[in-house]
From Swiss-Prot:
The keyword Disulfide bond does not apply. It comes from the Bacteria. It catalyses: N(6)-[(R)-lipoyl]-L-lysyl-[glycine-cleavage complex H protein] + glycine + H(+) = N(6)-[(R)-S(8)-aminomethyldihydrolipoyl]-L-lysyl-[glycine-cleavage complex H protein] + CO2. Its EC number is 1.4.4.2. This is Probable glycine dehydrogenase (decarboxylating) subunit 1.
Amino acid sequence: MRYLPLTPEDRVEMLGAIGVKSIDDLFVDVPVSARRDAPVDLPHHAGELDVEREMAGLARRNRAAGEGPFFCGAGAYRHHVPATVDHIIQRSEFLTSYTPYQPEIAQGTLQVLFEFQTQVAALTGMEVANASLYDGSTGAAEAVMMAQRVTRRNKAVMSGGVHPHYVGAIETLAHAAGVATQALPAAVDAEDAVIAAIDQDTACVVVQTPNVFGTVTDVSKIAEAAHAAGALLIVVTTEAVSFGLLKSPGEMGADIAVAEGQSIGNGLNFGGPYVGLFACKEKFVRQMPGRLCGETVDADGKRGFVLTLSTREQHIRRDKATSNICTNSGLCALAFSIHMSLLGETGLRQLAAVNHQKALALRDALKAVPGVEILTPRFFNEFAIRVPGKAAEVVEILAAHGVIAGVPFSRLDAKAGLDDVLLVAATETTLDIDIPVFAKALTKVFAQ
């Protein structure tokens, strides 16, 4: 097909067909203050080499995670990704994030998704898992919508330990769906407050373990309280490696388990793309959002894989759809599945143990720093500390000395009144020498 550009006469004819005089008439509902009528002042075009140099200069303004001591977490964790993962996902058969709509030519991709679902169900201790969602936060929001459909109630209670960004995503989607949300105040240990907030109008209770402060909680009591009130329990996990050591959501009575899978097979990716893990009890499968890959038998009796229970709005009436998720980061799900296959159950357990040991060493070192208070009593590979003054200022000072000290809680929730709280994490990538360097740097800052 040839490309035929629009002529001025074509534009006049098209505008007349829709009943307007000019292109500007199409944007009268946009406030004048929000319009940009003047040309954008962009630099002149440049050759490829010059552009590469310019981009490299911009990149040098950032400090890469591996350039020095690095203790950031708060929902995005630096882990080692084996070279095998990148090698396999770059095969031409896999290098696409697109939905495998035609099963007859996508059996390999569909089988990978089926294996991914099996791995996620095993990790979360649930009966069924979908083929991934965009990320952990949107997965949590989808879980709340699912709970509304299952219970026919319109209230979601969110623990004070749920990551503030997840709370924001839930509130955004819930508002449009007519679901009332009750976000409890941020708290290191929020179990009692959550139980007290459950009532007969509650559709679901959203808890996180390890929570945003790193606290590990057995949420079995919360599950009992939620179920007694007829509500569902949604358990969120932002650090998937923790599944190697801790009780699974299913073991603790979760109805829906949501997790961010970035920690396995995926880098920090400057905040995205990530991969959302979503699993639930089988009795709720018809209300589960996203795609589900199933195993079947063809007309010749051969095993095959297909997308099943596709209740997305692209397939059925919008008001009956369980989600509107479209092409998501399927390649990230593949990376997750490959890394999990390389680790195996024993490897994941060993990796999780190393993470916990590194965090214990970090805790012991920081506990000895005058002025530092350890706030998190039980943790996996991340915990919160209280520092003298504002944590954000401490982070900036240490960054100037080459130490990325962690994430100030105020950057996640500026209104929580926790300006002196710093979240620090350690993984298998944390060098033993990095820990005393961090502790000594903190000591010097507080001594000034």
